[in-house]
From Swiss-Prot:
Residues 39-42, 100-128 are extracellular. Expressed in the floral organ abscission zone and flower buds. The keyword Glycoprotein applies. This is CASP-like protein 5C3. One of its GO terms (cellular component) is plasma membrane. Glycans are attached at residue 111. The keyword Glycoprotein applies. Its main location: membrane.
């Protein structure tokens, strides 16, 4: 079996998972601090997807911790395929939510009376954190997909 850095069961994967959780939590936190986020569908979508990404990554971080502690590589192709597909789905959803939230922030910024600068900055920072979550999620998916052929 080929050792791919960033694939399930490695310390690099654990780092990616923890990074995804922290960024998703930060995005969720900055979005929900704003009192009016529920008025915009894109912001509600971002909150929903980041709320979904946190337990997904927490579960896979526990799998990584288990594999790292036992020093066993993850060698189950079907489960790895399911994890890769799940990461890809979370990645696409995170990109869609980050893009839609960033678009709404740009529209709100053009009309300063509808969004005070401090609130718009929070929303923009939440969208930025969601983009970073997407990047780490895509990385995890690609690393696991890269490992998959060596297990089959």
């Amino acid at each position: 079996m080929v050792e791919v850095p960033g694939s399930v069961g490695t310390t690099a994967s654990l780092s990616l998972r923890l990074g995804q959780m922290v960024l998703a939590f930060g995005s969720l936190l900055f979005m929900t601090i704003g009192v009016r986020f529920y008025q915009f569908t894109a912001f509600c979508y971002l909150v929903t997807i980041m709320s979904l990404a946190i337990p997904w990554n927490l579960t896979l971080a526990m799998v990584d911790i288990y594999c790292v502690i036992l020093q066993q590589p993850f060698q189950k192709p079907r489960i790895l395929l399911a994890i890769s597909i799940g990461d890809w789905v979370v990645s696409v959803l995170a990109l869609a939510s980050a893009s839609s939230a960033a678009s709404v922030v740009d529209i709100l910024r053009s009309n300063e009376s509808s969004c005070p600068p401090t609130i718009c900055n929070r929303y923009q920072f939440a969208a930025t954190l969601a983009f970073l979550t997407w990047f780490l999620s895509l990385s995890s998916s690609l690393f696991n997909l890269w490992l998959l052929p060596s297990l089959i």
